[in-house]
Amino acid sequence: MSQPPPASNLQKLRAALLSYPAALSALWAIPDRTAFADKVAEMGRGAGVDMAVADILAAMTPRGPKTPAMPVKGAGLSPSWMPSWLSITGQGARLDWVYAGGEAFTAPFADQDFARLATHPLNQLLPAISDPGELGSLPGPERPIDGMIFHISRCGSTLASRMLAQVPDILVLSEPQAIAAVLSAHTLIRIDPRVQQAWLNGVLGAYVRAAGTRRLVIKLDVDSLFDHARLRQASPQTPFAVLHRDPLEILVAQTGGSEPKPGLPPPEEVARWLAALCVTGARAVAAGARPVGYEDLAETVLDPDRPFLNLQIGPAYRARMAAVASLDAKSPNKRFTPDSLARQAAADERLKMLARQVIGPAWEPLAGLR
């Protein structure tokens, strides 16, 4: 087996490739590892770096936290690079970048798409990471993000994002980890709120640039609802939606119903968390977000008369979206099976009381019931 080439040669080759976006674009079209290495060797010779194909192949390693990283300056990366993972630990912090090449994100969650992209030879040869502190120096969104989706958990947000992903000119990022990590950074390190906001602006700006001419929709993870004001500050003209559902059905899904699984929080704790989400969701609606109930979700996303997130979508793509609505959002190879009645039936009196007394008073204003 070939040993990795001398670091100096590898560093020179990587630097040469990074400085030439057209080269990266050409390499992205070559998924075969050997053909990719052949082309890299040819490009290297043109840049004055002579490396054997075997050495290039040896330098292409699977991406992961233990992968020998390639430190870069985030500001020097082309728009095709996207923040894929932000890690903050007691040992330090790193922001991983993945070259996306303008590809669509079609998996239920962005992390799955980033993992797929990371297997491309280009991302294995160029395992780019940067100091998260540099996010503050990156430009924020240069245009408004086209839509953001918040939710109070288990209420169809993945379905909404999967439906929108059927439209070629819409890039949908479903719960990108880097955004959630920035929003929770203050729980792990001491960080000035203004710096944290600058980090958020930098991540969002990178995603907007990666979208290019496509419209960008971001579906946030559930706890990001608590930070809706920060996200609105980063892109104040963005249409927002808050998805919700009957609190008993969510509570059953989050607790396991009358037969809870070991390791889950007590139902009372889950109920208080859901109530807090509903209160925050109602505040987001008061600030201009659109509330959407689970039972109306598919019809709302497909409605041409009052477009969801103000997104204009033609009838042909609406037909594709409708077809996706008949599938399980998180397991697209399966047909969707309605589960509302089953969840209601799985609730014991304890859960019914919590849904009625703890969550209900917070959910009803969000749902427009009072």
Where does each model-flagged region fall?
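Short catalytic-loop micro-motif centered on adjacent basic/acidic residues
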Residues: A26, R215-K219, R290-G293
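PAPS-dependent sulfotransferases, especially Golgi type II membrane carbohydrate sulfotransferases
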Residues: P65-P139, C278-P291, E295-R370
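PAPS-dependent sulfotransferase catalytic domain
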Residues: P83-S87, G92-R94, A100-G101, F105-A298, L302-A316
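Terminal, compositionally biased segments used for targeting/anchoring and flexible tails
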Residues: M1-G76
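Generic alpha-helical segment signature
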Residues: Q3-P6, R33, P193-Q197, L274
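A polyampholytic, Gly/Pro-enriched intrinsically disordered region
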Residues: I191-G202, E259-P266, R335-A345
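Surface-exposed cleft-lining segments at the edges of enzyme active sites
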Residues: D146, R215-L216, G263-E268, A323
